């Protein structure tokens, strides 16, 4: 994470410059167009002084970060949300939003995204929780607190506990593969009767009215 040139210039690894630059990087990531989970993992990679992409700690952090926040808000992991809410008998298959919403066609890729099933209130709560977590990390950097991978991974539950959110006790009862299979099975049934309203259809309909 640290630039080799900085070390050659003789600057202290954890000096003021390190934390100032780290804070700038974190804020740049926050302002980017990356998805929220990508932002968290990007910040993890930037902040951890012993970062190793192949570490079991890193793999576990990347695999569980989304679930920790989903569980904090809904009491379910991402896979559990998808598995229990994907239903071909419901309007829009149970989705509250999708790539082409509100009037566009629902695609198979839409039905395996947990956030697409959340109510507007839950989405606001989720985004607010993640934003507050980013603020918490910035405060730690401003106080010149460095993170190891273990410390950064632990900071998530530390933050959630302090703010009285639910804490995910395990890896959940439904796997990502099970959730995806169930959602796609429901989609295949739903898609048979999904209305198609193309520009051509609209033009013909307008001519007939």
Model-derived features with residue positions:
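Positively charged, phosphate-engaging catalytic surfaces used for nucleic-acid and nucleotide handling
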Residues: 1-209
């Amino acid at each position: 994470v640290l630039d080799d040139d900085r070390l050659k210039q003789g600057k202290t690894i954890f000096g003021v410059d390190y934390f100032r630059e780290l804070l700038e990087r974190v804020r740049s990531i926050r302002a980017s167009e990356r998805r929220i989970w990508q932002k968290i993992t990007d910040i993890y990679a930037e902040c951890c002084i012993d970062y190793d992409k192949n570490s079991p700690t890193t793999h576990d952090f990347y695999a569980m970060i989304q679930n920790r926040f989903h569980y904090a808000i809904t009491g379910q992991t991402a896979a559990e949300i998808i598995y229990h809410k994907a239903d071909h008998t419901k309007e829009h298959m149970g989705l509250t939003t999708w790539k082409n919403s509100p009037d566009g066609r629902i695609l198979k890729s839409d039905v395996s995204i947990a956030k697409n099933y959340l109510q507007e209130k839950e989405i606001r709560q989720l985004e607010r929780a993640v934003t507050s977590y980013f603020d918490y990390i910035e405060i730690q950097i401003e106080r010149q607190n460095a993170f190891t991978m273990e410390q950064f991974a632990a900071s998530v539950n530390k933050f959630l506990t302090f703010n009285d959110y639910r804490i995910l006790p395990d890896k959940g009862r439904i796997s990502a593969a099970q959730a995806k299979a169930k959602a796609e099975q429901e989609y295949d049934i739903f898609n048979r009767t999904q209305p198609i309203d193309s520009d051509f259809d609209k033009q013909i309909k307008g001519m007939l009215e």
